């Protein structure tokens, strides 16, 4: 299907380097998507949309996989991923819009996922099959046809969002086997086709600095992230012959969103090694909104510690202090793997709620002290 589409041609992204696979297309989370003027959708009554995706992450506002939608007029259809790994299907009938989500099965990060959306015009419902499981079904009444807008079809981008806005809705990961069929396949066939033969294949992503080697405007000597987004370098310490420093990172796109802890290490403070993310937010955990700024030290027992701001919009107040330390300092001298304490170590006391972050911790006279910025 993608052979009929054009890739975003914006010259602002002319230095992008796109990984290649024979069987799949890569979407970098901000500059790569595909589009075409649509015509065949106008005649579609019953149909099936099918694709396989291996996402690496999802932005806080969600990312589109398929979108031919005008939300102002409630026309068209969109299939999106939400930040909590659900598949969202939006149906527009013209003046009326219905939305439903995956329930029984959601998508996995870094693995192949098979998704099928089956619109049953005569029966009056829409099936959502995720990884061979009927994850949800929406009923809406028989013989209701989707009203398609006169908009292009986008693959990997939300049609309603400008590519330059802070929340871009651009898919990040691999995608393959995209099909749009002008018939509603049986649920048995959809499940049979979703065996996930390659579901055990881990699909890894490694940030790539090489695309910027010839960029005269990019610093070559000073510390800088391998790609996309960086702010607030913090938590420097020396341990086992290495200097460590961390920073606020977003591997999805060059915007402040879905903030995690990037990590660099060096023996001489000149030549730095990119390391995996030290901290990543987790759905359903105390830091699901983001792992924000903090500090680091080597404690009185000689163990490195990270103190960071745990953001969680489902809590009130929504900011608190969390703690993490390396999993194994002997087997992992570069401290690539960190484990979080199971509970928060400091929550906000009575006062102005909602601004309680950036803990700075130090040792003085054999005691630990902490300063926290607040409003």
PLM region spans:
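Beta-rich carbohydrate-recognition and catalytic domains
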Residues: 188-375
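Extracellular glycan-associated modules
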Residues: 1-205, 210
